[in-house]
Amino acid sequence: MIPLKDDNPTSTKPIVSYGIIGFCVLIFLAQLGLTEQELRDFTYSYGLIPSVLMGIDQLPNDLSKISPIGTIFTSMFMHGGWMHLIGNMLYLWIFADNIEDDLGTLNFVIFYFVSGVGAAMSQVIIDVNSQIPMIGASGAIGGVLGAYLINYPNARVLVLIPFGFFSQLIKIRSIYVLGFWFILQFVNSFLSSSSGGGVAYAAHIGGFITGLVLILFFNKKTKKKVFKSKIKKTKKGPWEQ
């Protein structure tokens, strides 16, 4: 099930969401110009390494470019391949604009990065000794998905459902699209191995839950605005994270 777009207009331009997408693309394009060794060094310098963050290990001096805490944020803009980047940016493009519209620019910035921190720490906690860099925006985007599920459970989302050589386009409620995504993260987290890298499913789950909690707080803070927008809009219808 691949979401393509939602039927949920906004009243403002999501400049923060566009900025995040643009910056992630620029960083990835810069990565493409690196040699294999340079890319490895770049990933270890700016990716989030659980054992380094927790003070268990230290990076060599030539790789220690910023503080371990700083890598929580730099890692959110790095991606391990085209599919990793495109998948993350697609979800951000579809779902982030409405949450940014609800929260406003500054609150959305806070929301997005706190969701990313919650996601990162969820992965770190389950494997504090890991020396594998964690990169990707999926955890922070998971927070956006959690918020969207709360604010727009009935919004219609156009999805592509592959059936072997055939595919079907249908519109379904976001609660089913995002619920399916969340369940899939849980299932995959039990099926995957943490020994050699892969996908940081715990970060996805942690980001989603963080977003759920945060949006409830922000909804109280901006209750009047969110309530109006919900009524208006729902009428119509390495470790990679």
What are these language model-derived features?
Residues 1-241:
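A detector for small-residue-rich transmembrane helices and their helix-helix packing motifs
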